[in-house]
């Protein structure tokens, strides 16, 4: 199966006064974390500076308002997915997946999404340098998440 939870998922947006090109399809790379920044941007509401007496941490998401308005929007340089046991990182055509299937040793899987969008052929063993580079990014990200504490 693929590891695109919340990433490669259709979204239907209805906003007659804001979306000018009705019926348009966008292939903008996005994630669920982009919804809050998009809503705030569309409503011109500024996020609170503090939450519970603590400074608000920077959100992972970005506003998709430009895409909704028919403008070209570059894909994020890196996109993280972390839910339950599913973990993945997308960077350009690459996807690094931390696989922890029951009964198997936890390991990294690497997919070339440009040539294998269904994530069939794991390239981790034939491209260990790419795995190492992306794993380093992932591990730095994990430290940030752990330092934030539990949700």
Predicted regions and their residues:
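C-terminal cap/loop subdomain of S1 sulfatases and analogous C-terminal strand-loop tails that border
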Residues: 1-5, 19-28, 32-113, 141-150
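Active-site-proximal N-terminal segment of extracellular/periplasmic enzymes that hydrolyze or transfer
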Residues: 121-129
